[in-house]
Amino acid sequence: MQLSPSEISGLIKQRIEKFDNSVELKSEGTIVSVADGIVTIYGLNDVVAGEMIKLPGDVYGLALNLNTDSVGAVVLGDYEHIKEGDKAYCTGRILEVPVGEALLGRVVDALGNPIDGKGEVATDLTSPIEKIAPGVIWRKSVDQALQTGIKSIDSMVPIGRGQRELIIGDRQIGKTAIAVDTIINQKGTGVKCIYVAIGQKASTIANIVRQLEEHGAMEHTIIVAATASDSAALQYIAPYAGCSMGEYFRDRGQDALIVYDDLTKQAWAYRQISLLLRRPPGREAYPGDVFYLHSRLLERAARVNEEYVEKFTNGEVKGKTGSLTALPIIETQAGDISAFVPTNVISITDGQIFLETDLFNSGLRPAINPGNSVSRVGGAAQTKIIKKLGGGIRLALAQYRELEAFSQFASDLDEATRAQLNRGQRVTELLKQKQFSTLSVALMALSLYAADNGYLDNLEVSEVIPFESALHALAETKYSDVIAEINETGKYDADIADKLKIIVEDCKANQAW
Protein backbone atom coordinates (compact mmCIF):
# COMPACT_ATOMS: atom_id res chain seq x y z
CA MET A 1 0.00 0.00 0.00
CA GLN A 2 1.42 3.34 -1.08
CA LEU A 3 0.66 6.60 0.72
CA SER A 4 0.37 9.92 -1.07
CA PRO A 5 2.55 12.84 0.14
CA SER A 6 -0.54 14.60 1.59
CA GLU A 7 -1.46 11.48 3.63
CA ILE A 8 2.11 11.19 4.94
CA SER A 9 2.14 14.84 6.06
CA GLY A 10 -1.27 14.30 7.73
CA LEU A 11 0.05 11.28 9.64
CA ILE A 12 3.13 13.23 10.75
CA LYS A 13 0.89 16.07 11.99
CA GLN A 14 -1.24 13.59 13.96
CA ARG A 15 1.83 12.05 15.59
CA ILE A 16 3.22 15.48 16.48
CA GLU A 17 -0.08 16.49 18.08
CA LYS A 18 -0.16 13.29 20.18
CA PHE A 19 3.50 13.57 21.19
CA ASP A 20 3.88 13.90 24.96
CA ASN A 21 6.87 16.09 25.71
CA SER A 22 6.74 15.82 29.52
CA VAL A 23 10.12 15.47 31.20
CA GLU A 24 10.64 13.03 34.08
CA LEU A 25 13.23 14.27 36.54
CA LYS A 26 15.08 11.60 38.48
CA SER A 27 17.32 12.48 41.39
CA GLU A 28 20.43 10.37 40.91
CA GLY A 29 23.37 9.92 43.25
CA THR A 30 26.63 7.99 43.32
CA ILE A 31 27.59 5.58 46.09
CA VAL A 32 30.93 6.71 47.52
CA SER A 33 31.26 4.10 50.28
CA VAL A 34 29.56 0.93 51.49
CA ALA A 35 30.42 -0.87 54.73
CA ASP A 36 28.58 -2.72 57.54
CA GLY A 37 25.18 -2.18 55.92
CA ILE A 38 25.65 1.60 55.65
CA VAL A 39 25.95 3.35 52.27
CA THR A 40 27.14 6.93 51.78
CA ILE A 41 25.69 8.54 48.64
CA TYR A 42 26.85 11.75 46.95
CA GLY A 43 24.50 13.86 44.82
CA LEU A 44 21.01 12.97 46.10
CA ASN A 45 19.93 16.57 46.65
CA ASP A 46 16.15 16.01 46.83
CA VAL A 47 16.07 13.18 49.37
CA VAL A 48 13.96 13.55 52.54
CA ALA A 49 14.55 11.94 55.95
CA GLY A 50 13.17 8.40 56.08
CA GLU A 51 12.79 8.16 52.28
CA MET A 52 13.41 4.86 50.49
CA ILE A 53 16.42 4.98 48.16
CA LYS A 54 16.62 2.59 45.18
CA LEU A 55 19.96 0.78 45.24
CA PRO A 56 21.42 -1.71 42.71
CA GLY A 57 19.98 -5.24 42.62
CA ASP A 58 16.38 -4.41 43.61
CA VAL A 59 17.45 -3.47 47.15
CA TYR A 60 16.29 -0.39 49.02
CA GLY A 61 17.98 1.82 51.59
CA LEU A 62 16.49 4.06 54.27
CA ALA A 63 17.83 7.63 54.35
CA LEU A 64 18.77 8.47 57.94
CA ASN A 65 21.65 10.97 57.76
CA LEU A 66 21.19 14.09 55.59
CA ASN A 67 24.53 15.88 55.37
CA THR A 68 25.44 18.97 53.32
CA ASP A 69 26.96 17.04 50.41
CA SER A 70 26.07 13.39 51.13
CA VAL A 71 23.37 11.06 52.42
CA GLY A 72 23.89 8.23 54.92
CA ALA A 73 21.46 5.36 54.36
CA VAL A 74 21.00 1.96 55.96
CA VAL A 75 20.49 -0.99 53.56
CA LEU A 76 17.30 -3.01 54.05
CA GLY A 77 18.65 -6.36 52.92
CA ASP A 78 21.77 -7.84 51.37
CA TYR A 79 24.48 -5.31 50.47
CA GLU A 80 27.39 -7.51 49.33
CA HIS A 81 26.73 -6.81 45.62
CA ILE A 82 26.72 -3.01 46.13
CA LYS A 83 30.02 -1.31 45.32
CA GLU A 84 31.56 2.14 45.17
CA GLY A 85 30.54 4.05 42.02
CA ASP A 86 27.10 2.39 41.71
CA LYS A 87 24.10 4.65 41.11
CA ALA A 88 21.31 5.30 43.66
CA TYR A 89 17.94 6.95 43.02
CA CYS A 90 15.31 8.77 45.08
CA THR A 91 11.90 7.05 45.06
CA GLY A 92 9.79 9.82 46.61
CA ARG A 93 8.22 7.18 48.89
CA ILE A 94 8.60 6.40 52.57
CA LEU A 95 8.74 2.80 53.78
CA GLU A 96 5.37 1.02 53.80
CA VAL A 97 4.32 -2.47 54.91
CA PRO A 98 1.29 -4.60 53.97
CA VAL A 99 -1.64 -4.44 56.44
CA GLY A 100 -5.08 -6.01 56.73
CA GLU A 101 -7.01 -9.10 57.81
CA ALA A 102 -5.08 -11.28 55.33
CA LEU A 103 -2.00 -11.08 57.58
CA LEU A 104 -3.73 -12.90 60.45
CA GLY A 105 -2.25 -16.36 60.96
CA ARG A 106 0.91 -15.45 59.05
CA VAL A 107 4.60 -15.01 59.93
CA VAL A 108 6.22 -12.08 58.12
CA ASP A 109 9.57 -10.30 58.23
CA ALA A 110 10.08 -6.63 59.15
CA LEU A 111 9.17 -5.55 55.59
CA GLY A 112 5.95 -7.60 55.57
CA ASN A 113 7.26 -10.37 53.30
CA PRO A 114 5.91 -13.83 54.25
CA ILE A 115 8.51 -16.23 55.72
CA ASP A 116 6.21 -19.10 56.72
CA GLY A 117 6.13 -20.91 53.36
CA LYS A 118 2.37 -20.38 52.91
CA GLY A 119 2.59 -18.25 49.77
CA GLU A 120 1.97 -14.57 49.20
CA VAL A 121 -0.10 -12.42 51.57
CA ALA A 122 -3.41 -11.69 49.80
CA THR A 123 -3.65 -7.95 50.51
CA ASP A 124 -3.14 -4.80 48.44
CA LEU A 125 -3.39 -2.50 51.46
CA THR A 126 -0.22 -0.86 52.74
CA SER A 127 0.58 1.62 55.49
CA PRO A 128 3.66 3.74 56.30
CA ILE A 129 5.72 2.35 59.19
CA GLU A 130 6.15 5.83 60.70
CA LYS A 131 2.93 7.62 61.66
CA ILE A 132 2.07 10.45 64.01
CA ALA A 133 0.21 9.16 67.09
CA PRO A 134 -3.45 10.25 67.55
CA GLY A 135 -3.77 13.65 69.25
CA VAL A 136 -5.30 14.22 72.68
CA ILE A 137 -8.62 15.32 71.15
CA TRP A 138 -9.07 11.93 69.39
CA ARG A 139 -8.30 9.80 72.45
CA LYS A 140 -10.69 8.19 74.90
CA SER A 141 -9.87 7.19 78.47
CA VAL A 142 -9.11 3.52 79.10
CA ASP A 143 -12.19 1.86 80.63
CA GLN A 144 -12.41 -1.63 79.10
CA ALA A 145 -10.47 -4.54 80.58
CA LEU A 146 -8.04 -6.63 78.59
CA GLN A 147 -8.03 -9.96 80.44
CA THR A 148 -4.68 -11.76 80.51
CA GLY A 149 -6.11 -14.81 82.30
CA ILE A 150 -3.23 -14.59 84.80
CA LYS A 151 -4.45 -14.19 88.41
CA SER A 152 -1.62 -12.03 89.73
CA ILE A 153 -1.88 -9.58 86.80
CA ASP A 154 -5.66 -9.27 86.46
CA SER A 155 -6.14 -8.87 90.23
CA MET A 156 -3.17 -6.61 91.13
CA VAL A 157 -1.80 -5.04 87.91
CA PRO A 158 -4.86 -4.87 85.62
CA ILE A 159 -4.44 -3.95 81.96
CA GLY A 160 -7.01 -1.93 80.00
CA ARG A 161 -7.59 -1.75 76.25
CA GLY A 162 -5.43 1.05 74.87
CA GLN A 163 -2.91 0.92 77.73
CA ARG A 164 0.90 0.54 77.49
CA GLU A 165 2.07 -1.92 80.18
CA LEU A 166 5.77 -2.73 80.38
CA ILE A 167 6.96 -6.26 81.23
CA ILE A 168 10.45 -5.94 82.70
CA GLY A 169 12.92 -8.42 84.18
CA ASP A 170 16.13 -10.38 83.66
CA ARG A 171 16.57 -13.01 80.95
CA GLN A 172 14.91 -16.45 81.23
CA ILE A 173 12.40 -15.32 83.85
CA GLY A 174 9.06 -15.75 82.06
CA LYS A 175 8.50 -12.40 80.28
CA THR A 176 7.61 -13.98 76.93
CA ALA A 177 5.46 -16.59 78.72
CA ILE A 178 3.23 -13.82 80.13
CA ALA A 179 2.90 -12.21 76.67
CA VAL A 180 2.11 -15.54 74.93
CA ASP A 181 -0.49 -16.45 77.59
CA THR A 182 -2.13 -13.03 77.11
CA ILE A 183 -2.32 -13.62 73.33
CA ILE A 184 -3.83 -17.09 73.88
CA ASN A 185 -6.39 -15.62 76.30
CA GLN A 186 -7.71 -13.24 73.59
CA LYS A 187 -9.18 -16.19 71.68
CA GLY A 188 -12.88 -15.56 71.12
CA THR A 189 -12.76 -11.95 72.39
CA GLY A 190 -12.31 -10.31 68.97
CA VAL A 191 -8.96 -8.79 69.97
CA LYS A 192 -6.40 -9.12 67.14
CA CYS A 193 -2.82 -9.76 68.29
CA ILE A 194 0.56 -8.85 66.81
CA TYR A 195 3.72 -10.42 68.23
CA VAL A 196 6.92 -8.64 67.20
CA ALA A 197 10.07 -10.72 67.79
CA ILE A 198 13.24 -8.61 67.73
CA GLY A 199 16.69 -10.17 67.69
CA GLN A 200 15.52 -13.63 68.78
CA LYS A 201 16.73 -16.97 67.49
CA ALA A 202 14.66 -18.34 64.60
CA SER A 203 14.16 -21.59 66.59
CA THR A 204 12.64 -19.60 69.50
CA ILE A 205 10.19 -17.86 67.16
CA ALA A 206 9.27 -21.20 65.54
CA ASN A 207 8.55 -22.58 69.02
CA ILE A 208 6.24 -19.64 69.83
CA VAL A 209 4.39 -20.15 66.50
CA ARG A 210 3.93 -23.84 67.39
CA GLN A 211 2.59 -22.98 70.88
CA LEU A 212 0.10 -20.47 69.45
CA GLU A 213 -1.05 -22.98 66.80
CA GLU A 214 -1.54 -25.70 69.44
CA HIS A 215 -3.79 -23.40 71.47
CA GLY A 216 -5.74 -22.10 68.46
CA ALA A 217 -4.38 -18.57 68.81
CA MET A 218 -2.66 -18.15 65.42
CA GLU A 219 -6.04 -17.43 63.79
CA HIS A 220 -6.13 -13.99 65.45
CA THR A 221 -2.36 -13.34 65.52
CA ILE A 222 0.27 -11.82 63.19
CA ILE A 223 3.93 -12.58 63.92
CA VAL A 224 6.54 -10.06 62.75
CA ALA A 225 10.00 -11.62 63.01
CA ALA A 226 13.34 -9.82 62.82
CA THR A 227 15.64 -12.64 63.89
CA ALA A 228 19.13 -12.42 65.35
CA SER A 229 20.54 -13.25 61.88
CA ASP A 230 18.72 -10.29 60.29
CA SER A 231 20.46 -6.94 59.85
CA ALA A 232 20.33 -4.23 62.53
CA ALA A 233 18.19 -2.15 60.14
CA LEU A 234 15.43 -4.78 60.07
CA GLN A 235 15.56 -5.20 63.86
CA TYR A 236 15.22 -1.42 64.18
CA ILE A 237 12.15 -1.09 61.91
CA ALA A 238 10.32 -4.30 62.98
CA PRO A 239 8.38 -2.71 65.91
CA TYR A 240 7.18 0.17 63.70
CA ALA A 241 6.05 -2.30 61.02
CA GLY A 242 4.13 -4.35 63.61
CA CYS A 243 2.58 -1.17 65.03
CA SER A 244 1.25 -0.15 61.59
CA MET A 245 -0.36 -3.60 61.25
CA GLY A 246 -2.03 -3.11 64.65
CA GLU A 247 -3.18 0.43 63.80
CA TYR A 248 -5.12 -0.97 60.83
CA PHE A 249 -7.50 -2.66 63.31
CA ARG A 250 -7.50 0.24 65.81
CA ASP A 251 -8.46 2.80 63.17
CA ARG A 252 -11.42 0.69 62.00
CA GLY A 253 -13.08 0.47 65.42
CA GLN A 254 -11.57 -2.86 66.49
CA ASP A 255 -9.34 -3.83 69.41
CA ALA A 256 -5.75 -5.00 68.94
CA LEU A 257 -2.89 -6.08 71.19
CA ILE A 258 0.79 -5.75 70.26
CA VAL A 259 3.75 -7.35 72.05
CA TYR A 260 7.27 -6.01 71.43
CA ASP A 261 9.71 -8.76 72.45
CA ASP A 262 11.97 -7.04 73.25
CA LEU A 263 12.73 -3.32 72.94
CA THR A 264 16.19 -3.70 74.52
CA LYS A 265 17.37 -5.47 71.37
CA GLN A 266 15.79 -2.77 69.20
CA ALA A 267 17.71 -0.13 71.17
CA TRP A 268 20.93 -2.14 70.65
CA ALA A 269 20.25 -2.31 66.89
CA TYR A 270 19.57 1.44 66.75
CA ARG A 271 22.74 2.14 68.73
CA GLN A 272 24.72 0.04 66.24
CA ILE A 273 23.23 1.90 63.25
CA SER A 274 23.80 5.31 64.90
CA LEU A 275 27.44 4.58 65.69
CA LEU A 276 28.04 3.33 62.12
CA LEU A 277 26.45 6.56 60.85
CA ARG A 278 28.95 8.41 63.09
CA ARG A 279 26.29 10.09 65.19
CA PRO A 280 27.68 11.35 68.54
CA PRO A 281 27.23 8.76 71.33
CA GLY A 282 25.76 9.66 74.74
CA ARG A 283 25.05 7.68 77.90
CA GLU A 284 25.91 3.95 77.52
CA ALA A 285 26.95 4.84 73.91
CA TYR A 286 23.28 5.28 72.90
CA PRO A 287 22.49 8.20 70.55
CA GLY A 288 20.74 11.29 71.90
CA ASP A 289 17.34 10.36 70.42
CA VAL A 290 16.99 6.87 71.93
CA PHE A 291 14.13 8.14 74.15
CA TYR A 292 12.30 9.37 71.04
CA LEU A 293 12.94 5.97 69.42
CA HIS A 294 10.62 4.34 71.96
CA SER A 295 8.26 7.23 72.79
CA ARG A 296 7.11 7.72 69.18
CA LEU A 297 6.45 3.97 68.97
CA LEU A 298 4.57 3.53 72.25
CA GLU A 299 2.49 6.71 71.89
CA ARG A 300 0.81 5.07 68.89
CA ALA A 301 -0.85 2.59 71.27
CA ALA A 302 -4.07 4.32 72.32
CA ARG A 303 -7.82 4.09 72.72
CA VAL A 304 -9.41 6.29 70.06
CA ASN A 305 -12.94 7.72 70.20
CA GLU A 306 -15.93 7.26 67.88
CA GLU A 307 -15.26 10.52 66.00
CA TYR A 308 -11.73 9.41 65.11
CA VAL A 309 -12.93 6.03 63.75
CA GLU A 310 -15.79 7.64 61.81
CA LYS A 311 -13.45 10.27 60.30
CA PHE A 312 -10.80 7.68 59.41
CA THR A 313 -13.28 5.31 57.73
CA ASN A 314 -15.14 8.18 55.96
CA GLY A 315 -18.34 7.40 57.87
CA GLU A 316 -18.35 3.64 57.12
CA VAL A 317 -17.88 2.69 60.80
CA LYS A 318 -20.01 4.65 63.27
CA GLY A 319 -20.34 4.53 67.06
CA LYS A 320 -17.30 2.32 67.61
CA THR A 321 -14.09 3.02 69.50
CA GLY A 322 -10.80 1.40 68.56
CA SER A 323 -7.82 0.47 70.68
CA LEU A 324 -4.24 -0.70 70.37
CA THR A 325 -2.81 -2.10 73.62
CA ALA A 326 0.98 -2.40 73.86
CA LEU A 327 2.97 -4.85 75.99
CA PRO A 328 6.61 -3.81 75.49
CA ILE A 329 9.20 -6.14 77.03
CA ILE A 330 12.53 -4.90 78.42
CA GLU A 331 15.37 -7.19 79.48
CA THR A 332 17.39 -5.96 82.47
CA GLN A 333 20.93 -6.92 83.48
CA ALA A 334 21.09 -8.35 87.04
CA GLY A 335 17.79 -6.67 87.97
CA ASP A 336 19.07 -3.16 87.25
CA ILE A 337 15.90 -1.20 86.41
CA SER A 338 17.77 2.11 86.78
CA ALA A 339 19.74 1.59 83.53
CA PHE A 340 19.17 3.99 80.61
CA VAL A 341 16.66 2.11 78.42
CA PRO A 342 14.60 0.60 81.31
CA THR A 343 14.10 4.03 82.95
CA ASN A 344 13.16 5.54 79.57
CA VAL A 345 10.48 2.95 78.87
CA ILE A 346 9.17 2.98 82.48
CA SER A 347 8.60 6.74 82.12
CA ILE A 348 6.81 6.34 78.75
CA THR A 349 4.45 3.48 79.69
CA ASP A 350 1.32 3.45 81.89
CA GLY A 351 2.76 0.98 84.38
CA GLN A 352 5.07 -2.01 84.61
CA ILE A 353 5.03 -5.68 85.58
CA PHE A 354 8.33 -6.32 87.34
CA LEU A 355 9.61 -9.91 87.34
CA GLU A 356 12.26 -10.99 89.87
CA THR A 357 14.87 -13.74 89.56
CA ASP A 358 14.69 -14.66 93.28
CA LEU A 359 10.92 -15.17 93.11
CA PHE A 360 11.28 -17.24 89.93
CA ASN A 361 13.95 -19.46 91.50
CA SER A 362 11.86 -19.93 94.66
CA GLY A 363 9.09 -21.48 92.53
CA LEU A 364 6.73 -18.49 92.38
CA ARG A 365 5.74 -18.35 88.71
CA PRO A 366 4.80 -15.94 87.21
CA ALA A 367 7.55 -14.26 89.27
CA ILE A 368 5.77 -10.92 89.66
CA ASN A 369 6.94 -8.56 92.39
CA PRO A 370 3.72 -6.80 93.52
CA GLY A 371 5.69 -4.06 95.31
CA ASN A 372 7.44 -2.75 92.17
CA SER A 373 4.62 -3.60 89.75
CA VAL A 374 1.95 -0.99 89.08
CA SER A 375 -0.81 -0.19 86.60
CA ARG A 376 -1.47 3.55 86.35
CA VAL A 377 -4.69 3.46 84.33
CA GLY A 378 -5.84 -0.18 84.38
CA GLY A 379 -7.78 0.16 87.66
CA ALA A 380 -10.50 2.12 85.87
CA ALA A 381 -10.83 -0.67 83.31
CA GLN A 382 -10.75 -3.62 85.72
CA THR A 383 -13.72 -6.01 85.73
CA LYS A 384 -15.95 -5.09 88.71
CA ILE A 385 -15.89 -8.52 90.34
CA ILE A 386 -12.08 -8.85 90.07
CA LYS A 387 -11.61 -5.29 91.36
CA LYS A 388 -13.78 -6.00 94.41
CA LEU A 389 -12.21 -9.35 95.26
CA GLY A 390 -8.63 -8.55 94.20
CA GLY A 391 -8.19 -5.63 96.62
CA GLY A 392 -7.94 -7.96 99.61
CA ILE A 393 -5.30 -10.06 97.84
CA ARG A 394 -2.95 -7.12 97.36
CA LEU A 395 -3.40 -6.05 100.99
CA ALA A 396 -2.81 -9.59 102.31
CA LEU A 397 0.41 -9.86 100.27
CA ALA A 398 1.68 -6.44 101.35
CA GLN A 399 1.10 -7.28 105.03
CA TYR A 400 2.67 -10.71 104.58
CA ARG A 401 5.86 -9.33 102.98
CA GLU A 402 6.22 -6.76 105.77
CA LEU A 403 5.66 -9.28 108.56
CA GLU A 404 7.76 -12.00 106.91
CA ALA A 405 10.95 -9.96 107.31
CA PHE A 406 10.00 -9.05 110.90
CA SER A 407 9.03 -12.62 111.90
CA GLN A 408 12.53 -13.96 111.19
CA PHE A 409 13.78 -12.09 114.27
CA ALA A 410 10.80 -12.60 116.58
CA SER A 411 10.56 -15.88 118.50
CA ASP A 412 6.91 -15.74 119.62
CA LEU A 413 4.23 -14.03 117.56
CA ASP A 414 0.73 -13.00 118.63
CA GLU A 415 -2.31 -14.70 117.12
CA ALA A 416 -3.22 -11.87 114.71
CA THR A 417 0.31 -11.73 113.26
CA ARG A 418 0.38 -15.51 112.87
CA ALA A 419 -2.97 -15.39 111.06
CA GLN A 420 -1.69 -12.73 108.64
CA LEU A 421 1.46 -14.75 107.90
CA ASN A 422 -0.67 -17.86 107.48
CA ARG A 423 -2.98 -16.16 104.95
CA GLY A 424 -0.07 -14.53 103.11
CA GLN A 425 1.60 -17.90 102.53
CA ARG A 426 -1.60 -19.35 101.09
CA VAL A 427 -2.32 -16.31 98.90
CA THR A 428 1.25 -16.49 97.54
CA GLU A 429 0.70 -20.17 96.75
CA LEU A 430 -2.66 -19.42 95.11
CA LEU A 431 -1.06 -16.89 92.74
CA LYS A 432 1.18 -19.57 91.24
CA GLN A 433 -0.01 -20.46 87.76
CA LYS A 434 1.38 -22.75 85.09
CA GLN A 435 1.94 -21.51 81.56
CA PHE A 436 -0.95 -22.06 79.09
CA SER A 437 -3.47 -22.38 81.97
CA THR A 438 -5.23 -19.01 81.69
CA LEU A 439 -8.45 -18.54 83.65
CA SER A 440 -11.80 -16.99 82.78
CA VAL A 441 -13.10 -14.07 84.88
CA ALA A 442 -15.51 -16.34 86.79
CA LEU A 443 -12.93 -18.98 87.75
CA MET A 444 -10.46 -16.27 88.77
CA ALA A 445 -13.16 -14.60 90.89
CA LEU A 446 -13.89 -17.94 92.55
CA SER A 447 -10.24 -18.41 93.56
CA LEU A 448 -9.98 -14.82 94.85
CA TYR A 449 -13.24 -15.18 96.81
CA ALA A 450 -11.94 -18.34 98.52
CA ALA A 451 -8.70 -16.58 99.53
CA ASP A 452 -10.41 -13.33 100.55
CA ASN A 453 -12.93 -15.02 102.84
CA GLY A 454 -10.50 -17.28 104.68
CA TYR A 455 -11.44 -20.61 103.06
CA LEU A 456 -7.75 -21.39 102.45
CA ASP A 457 -6.59 -20.53 105.99
CA ASN A 458 -7.10 -24.01 107.44
CA LEU A 459 -5.55 -25.82 104.44
CA GLU A 460 -1.93 -26.91 104.28
CA VAL A 461 0.12 -24.78 101.84
CA SER A 462 0.65 -27.88 99.65
CA GLU A 463 -3.15 -28.35 99.43
CA VAL A 464 -3.93 -24.88 98.01
CA ILE A 465 -3.34 -25.69 94.30
CA PRO A 466 -5.16 -29.10 94.42
CA PHE A 467 -8.07 -27.38 96.24
CA GLU A 468 -8.23 -24.68 93.56
CA SER A 469 -8.25 -27.30 90.76
CA ALA A 470 -11.07 -29.21 92.48
CA LEU A 471 -13.00 -25.96 93.03
CA HIS A 472 -12.77 -25.03 89.33
CA ALA A 473 -13.74 -28.55 88.20
CA LEU A 474 -16.79 -28.52 90.49
CA ALA A 475 -17.85 -25.05 89.33
CA GLU A 476 -17.58 -25.93 85.63
CA THR A 477 -19.60 -29.15 85.95
CA LYS A 478 -22.19 -28.47 88.67
CA TYR A 479 -22.51 -24.67 88.62
CA SER A 480 -21.90 -23.85 84.94
CA ASP A 481 -24.84 -21.40 84.90
CA VAL A 482 -23.21 -19.26 87.64
CA ILE A 483 -19.87 -19.32 85.78
CA ALA A 484 -21.58 -18.25 82.53
CA GLU A 485 -23.44 -15.43 84.31
CA ILE A 486 -20.26 -14.00 85.89
CA ASN A 487 -18.30 -14.28 82.61
CA GLU A 488 -21.09 -12.45 80.79
CA THR A 489 -21.75 -9.57 83.22
CA GLY A 490 -18.60 -9.29 85.37
CA LYS A 491 -20.74 -7.74 88.12
CA TYR A 492 -20.40 -8.35 91.85
CA ASP A 493 -23.34 -8.02 94.23
CA ALA A 494 -24.82 -9.83 97.24
CA ASP A 495 -26.51 -12.40 94.98
CA ILE A 496 -23.24 -13.31 93.19
CA ALA A 497 -21.41 -13.40 96.55
CA ASP A 498 -23.97 -15.90 97.89
CA LYS A 499 -23.58 -18.10 94.80
CA LEU A 500 -19.78 -18.07 95.12
CA LYS A 501 -20.10 -18.95 98.81
CA ILE A 502 -22.29 -21.97 97.97
CA ILE A 503 -19.74 -23.27 95.41
CA VAL A 504 -16.74 -22.86 97.76
CA GLU A 505 -18.54 -24.43 100.74
CA ASP A 506 -19.74 -27.32 98.56
CA CYS A 507 -16.13 -27.98 97.52
CA LYS A 508 -14.88 -27.74 101.12
CA ALA A 509 -17.58 -30.18 102.26
CA ASN A 510 -16.70 -32.72 99.55
CA GLN A 511 -12.95 -32.57 100.26
CA ALA A 512 -12.46 -33.87 96.72
CA TRP A 513 -8.89 -32.66 96.48
Curated annotation (Swiss-Prot):
Site (Required for activity): give the residues: S373
Instruction: Report how it sits in the membrane.
Output: Peripheral membrane protein
Question: Predominant location of this chain?
Answer: membrane
Question: What SUPFAM superfamilies does the record tag this protein with?
Answer: C-terminal domain of alpha and beta subunits of F1 ATP synthase (SSF47917), N-terminal domain of alpha and beta subunits of F1 ATP synthase (SSF50615), P-loop containing nucleoside triphosphate hydrolases (SSF52540)
Q: Name one Pfam family in it.
A: ATP-synt_ab_N
Coiled-coil positions:
none
Q: Which GO terms describe its molecular function?
A: ADP binding; ATP binding; proton-transporting ATP synthase activity, rotational mechanism
Q: Which UniProt keywords apply?
A: ATP synthesis, ATP-binding, Cell inner membrane, Cell membrane, CF(1), Hydrogen ion transport, Ion transport, Membrane, Nucleotide-binding, Translocase, Transport
Q: Name one GO cellular component term.
A: plasma membrane
Q: Where in the cell is it found?
A: Cell inner membrane
Q: What does this protein do?
A: Produces ATP from ADP in the presence of a proton gradient across the membrane. The alpha chain is a regulatory subunit.
Protein name, per record: ATP synthase subunit alpha
State the gene name recorded for this protein: atpA
